[in-house]
Amino acid sequence: MTQDSYLVGLIGSGIGPSLSPALHEREAGRQGLRYHYRLIDIDRLGVGPEAVGGLVRAARDLGFDGLNITHPCKQLVISHLDTLAPQAEALGAVNTVVFEDGRAVGHNTDVTGFAASFARGLPDARLERVVQLGAGGAGAAVAHALLTLGAGHVTVVDALPERAAALAVALNRHFGDGRAAAASPDTLPKLLTDADGIVHATPTGMAAHPGIPLPAELLHPGLWVAEVVYRPLETELLRTARALGCATLDGGGMAVFQAVDAFRLFTGREPDSMRMLADIAELAGTAAVRH
């Protein structure tokens, strides 16, 4: 018998403004489901990201059906799970945990979420040379999505050089030598002069982490600029890029399409992505999500 009641949650830092509860609960309500989505904010709990394992175990013991995982726990959570779906294993990052027969199974819906959003929002973007800011959990997913979409070369830039290097090695192992490289932030002026586009995949610009992730003067109209941050939908980076005439993509589409895949994993039911795109534009107080 298909169940009609679900308890899920989100573990992360600074997640108070998250729209995930409303996105999931609205769609569930339209499908006649009782669906409760709870925020488990490590900042409010007064614990560090290393507590993610205990939080996952507690959720399982309390009868949760699944969890979403966000910054800064997407990689730390892996050692606390029973098994990983192939894509999560390839990425080394998990954003969705499903509890199945007492086992915690890690998935990653960020890859398909970003790929679907990019294909819809920037369908004509050149992908020969892409610069990506961020090599964390979201960054790993975005880089996989870019190369899956056919990017010729992705250069990963991160404040932690060893993290960027490790991601580049993993990408080349998965997609073939020469498809990815790591670079330090001080090389951005040269990189962006030659690039077709830039993807931002760090927390900078989120409500809890305001700011812009690179010097604004490095942007130019020849770049497309894609963002993974979705709260706010218009980050300082996107506002600056749009004013310069860059084609831009906000993080709303990725948020919706990864939620679509997570909802399907949690419930076994097919959500309506178009309704959810309308939801996020309404919830964020703007019609900025144009897909």
From Swiss-Prot:
<dbReference type="GO" id="GO:0009423">
    <property type="term" value="P:chorismate biosynthetic process"/>
</dbReference>
<feature type="binding site">
    <location>
        <position position="228"/>
    </location>
    <ligand>
        <name>NADP(+)</name>
    </ligand>
</feature>
<keyword id="KW-0560">Oxidoreductase</keyword>
<comment type="pathway">
    <text>Metabolic intermediate biosynthesis; chorismate biosynthesis; chorismate from D-erythrose 4-phosphate and phosphoenolpyruvate: step 4/7.</text>
</comment>
<comment type="function">
    <text>Involved in the biosynthesis of the chorismate, which leads to the biosynthesis of aromatic amino acids. Catalyzes the reversible NADPH linked reduction of 3-dehydroshikimate (DHSA) to yield shikimate (SA).</text>
</comment>
<dbReference type="InterPro" id="IPR046346">
    <property type="entry name" value="Aminoacid_DH-like_N_sf"/>
</dbReference>
<dbReference type="GO" id="GO:0019632">
    <property type="term" value="P:shikimate metabolic process"/>
</dbReference>
<feature type="binding site">
    <location>
        <position position="230"/>
    </location>
    <ligand>
        <name>shikimate</name>
    </ligand>
</feature>
<keyword id="KW-0057">Aromatic amino acid biosynthesis</keyword>
<dbReference type="GO" id="GO:0050661">
    <property type="term" value="F:NADP binding"/>
</dbReference>
<feature type="binding site">
    <location>
        <position position="110"/>
    </location>
    <ligand>
        <name>shikimate</name>
    </ligand>
</feature>
<keyword id="KW-0028">Amino-acid biosynthesis</keyword>
<dbReference type="GO" id="GO:0005829">
    <property type="term" value="C:cytosol"/>
</dbReference>
<feature type="binding site">
    <location>
        <position position="95"/>
    </location>
    <ligand>
        <name>shikimate</name>
    </ligand>
</feature>
<feature type="binding site">
    <location>
        <begin position="134"/>
        <end position="138"/>
    </location>
    <ligand>
        <name>NADP(+)</name>
    </ligand>
</feature>
<feature type="active site" description="Proton acceptor">
    <location>
        <position position="74"/>
    </location>
</feature>
<feature type="binding site">
    <location>
        <position position="70"/>
    </location>
    <ligand>
        <name>shikimate</name>
    </ligand>
</feature>
<protein>
    <recommendedName>
        <fullName>Shikimate dehydrogenase (NADP(+))</fullName>
        <ecNumber>1.1.1.25</ecNumber>
    </recommendedName>
</protein>
<dbReference type="GO" id="GO:0004764">
    <property type="term" value="F:shikimate 3-dehydrogenase (NADP+) activity"/>
</dbReference>
<dbReference type="GO" id="GO:0009073">
    <property type="term" value="P:aromatic amino acid family biosynthetic process"/>
</dbReference>
<dbReference type="Pfam" id="PF08501">
    <property type="entry name" value="Shikimate_dh_N"/>
</dbReference>
<comment type="subunit">
    <text>Homodimer.</text>
</comment>
<feature type="binding site">
    <location>
        <position position="251"/>
    </location>
    <ligand>
        <name>NADP(+)</name>
    </ligand>
</feature>
<dbReference type="InterPro" id="IPR036291">
    <property type="entry name" value="NAD(P)-bd_dom_sf"/>
</dbReference>
<dbReference type="InterPro" id="IPR013708">
    <property type="entry name" value="Shikimate_DH-bd_N"/>
</dbReference>
<comment type="similarity">
    <text>Belongs to the shikimate dehydrogenase family.</text>
</comment>
<keyword id="KW-0521">NADP</keyword>
<feature type="binding site">
    <location>
        <begin position="18"/>
        <end position="20"/>
    </location>
    <ligand>
        <name>shikimate</name>
    </ligand>
</feature>
<dbReference type="InterPro" id="IPR022893">
    <property type="entry name" value="Shikimate_DH_fam"/>
</dbReference>
<dbReference type="GO" id="GO:0008652">
    <property type="term" value="P:amino acid biosynthetic process"/>
</dbReference>
